[in-house]
């Protein structure tokens, strides 16, 4: 009887030696990882194609999200550089609010405006197209070097490369231009970047959102580089409608002439 009772107690005890094997089976049958679930192109790289809401800051604090140079994010200025960053309004809207006069928004302002963004991609290039002015940035993603001998431009020269599932876009050769929407918050000043601006963008999937980090390096103005994180939400329901037409010149009330502030669009 004692032996029989002991066998019953043994059979009631948990089989601890089975736990590692069960754990292995559970892990093997678990859902695929986030990396495996990413939309991918034919070459295996993440596919960012789609229409997204405008970038918004992650856990924002301070002014509106398009101001990437918020006080809590901006690096310290170099001595004497305040006059390069801040320019007083002079009454000429081509200087004070160039976008309202159909001039290019430039970068990074054009990327961070309050309109949708479409991304079109193939294994060689990615096209980032803001609805604002339809100013497409067509960026090679094969890791090639920057082009040489180009005139500085509003959107710079951009090249991309992959670091795992993150696309890294490096941009240089900018024309000195207005920086962001600071002129909407300060009636006396605008903010500008220098022609030494260098930006690095990092894009990667985080669920149905596209994580977007921009790093600003402007050695004529700031003592160091600094970054800010944004996110873009994928909107498949916007695919059928697409980006809307953005026409500025058709309503330009002073084309080719001398403009006044009241002539802004």
Cite the ranges covered by each PLM segment.
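N-terminal secretory signal peptides that target proteins for export/translocation
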Residues: 1-16
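PEST-like low-complexity, intrinsically disordered acidic/proline/serine-rich tracts
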Residues: 2-3, 32-265
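A composition/secondary-structure signal for short, hydrophobic, low-basic-content segments
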Residues: 9, 30-32
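Bacterial N-terminal signal peptides
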Residues: 17-30
